[in-house]
């Protein structure tokens, strides 16, 4: 009997977890994409949220997640994911990951963020990649241009115009925060495959919810000042020393408060001068800031909100299946209602591990087989991506209203860019227009309150 071939697009935490779990079950696995160090998982500083400490519980973590998500989370999904926290922890530690401490972050009732010197991704990703290679996972470097689908049936993926045939494909290529002008994530995370599968009949979910990290630092490039710095006691202040927000509120509230102060013409700073042993607790941030001429033990740190995490994505079920047989999505590429309207800090790495393990079980159970051997190929070039970034930043950013969103739609029509990227941007704007309320990461100044009639997820169907 021939081995089942599984192609995983993306080598971040979700992709590597799925690859290892599938390879351990005997599947022929390939990871297709850039180096794993070019993933947002690798950049993850704080850590992974796990309710494993004394006094904490799955129930409390679930309640924190739903409160942060402003009550439109899929509660069954939230329970499913968080109840697998011990399995996620055991998977990581059994493969050589050693956590060095626990931190408190905004929205959490307990210091349940398991971290590795606040450089968690840089430690986890190389360890898992080493294990994947030892299991003979095939790493194919390159840019997946599109998913090969023929009349609703999966054929594989296209790499430089060549169809690589697989029985199952798992999209683990991250979200689309790179479609915003300012992001601390990987700039290549532009959601191309999210738009690709949408054009081919897969609905998108909750696309209006884009999370902005409150404390980005723009220097030689854009960096994140991890939430854990505020958890350790850093304060947010204006240039004249005014404190204006609870630093440990959820990210949507803090980001919006900072943005409003900036609209008043006030600079906003992070004051970390009261943190003892900053250099030892946050070595990466310390080295970055010193390289930019700032000593966080003596100086205020200028910050700005930046696009950080896209809550919406490819609509999947509890088993990470799309509506196309053999096609799955996990991690930030996917959306099944876990985060609701706003992601609780450090829940993303938990979702990456859990979704990677769960999709491996799903594929092992269903054993899909490729039914077609070819598919149409249409990729040419990406086009004017920077203009999309400007439109989304200016018209579908931290604060929105009907006029600005409609103006963004108008500008979008004039941009010469790959239709799939235009579709992702259109999904964000139209979903934001339809949600005539403010909830979580989506804030409409013309509808500044939550409304009961919008207490549900949104779905975007490109052909409707």
Curated annotation (Swiss-Prot):
Binding site for FAD: 11-14, 40-47, 332, 348-349
Family recorded in the similarity comment: Belongs to the FAD-dependent oxidoreductase 2 family. NadB subfamily.
EC number(s) per entry: 1.4.3.16
Organism: Pyrococcus horikoshii (strain ATCC 700860 / DSM 12428 / JCM 9974 / NBRC 100139 / OT-3)
Any single GO CC term annotated in Swiss-Prot or TrEMBL for this entry: cytoplasm
Location (main, coarse): cytoplasm
Subcellular location: Cytoplasm
Cofactor: FAD
Gene3D superfamilies hit by this protein: FAD/NAD(P)-binding domain, Fumarate reductase/succinate dehydrogenase flavoprotein-like, C-terminal domain, Succinate dehydrogenase/fumarate reductase flavoprotein, catalytic domain
Active site (UniProt): 251
Keywords, comma-separated and alphabetical: Cytoplasm, FAD, Flavoprotein, Nucleotide-binding, Oxidoreductase, Pyridine nucleotide biosynthesis
Entry function: Catalyzes the oxidation of L-aspartate to iminoaspartate, the first step in the de novo biosynthesis of NAD(+).
InterPro entries for the chain: FAD-dep_OxRdtase_2_FAD-bd (IPR003953), FAD/NAD-bd_sf (IPR036188), Fum_R/Succ_DH_flav-like_C_sf (IPR037099), Fum_Rdtase/Succ_DH_flav-like_C (IPR015939), NadB (IPR005288), Succ_DH/fumarate_Rdtase_cat_sf (IPR027477)
Enzyme class at the top of the EC tree: oxidoreductase
GO molecular function term, any single one: nucleotide binding
The reaction(s) this protein catalyses: L-aspartate + O2 = iminosuccinate + H2O2
GO biological process: NAD biosynthetic process
Protein name: L-aspartate oxidase
Positions marked as site (Important in orienting the L-aspartate substrate): 105
Gene: nadB
Recorded metabolic or biological pathway in which this protein acts: Cofactor biosynthesis; NAD(+) biosynthesis; iminoaspartate from L-aspartate (oxidase route): step 1/1
Signal peptide per UniProt: none
CC cofactor note: Binds 1 FAD per subunit.
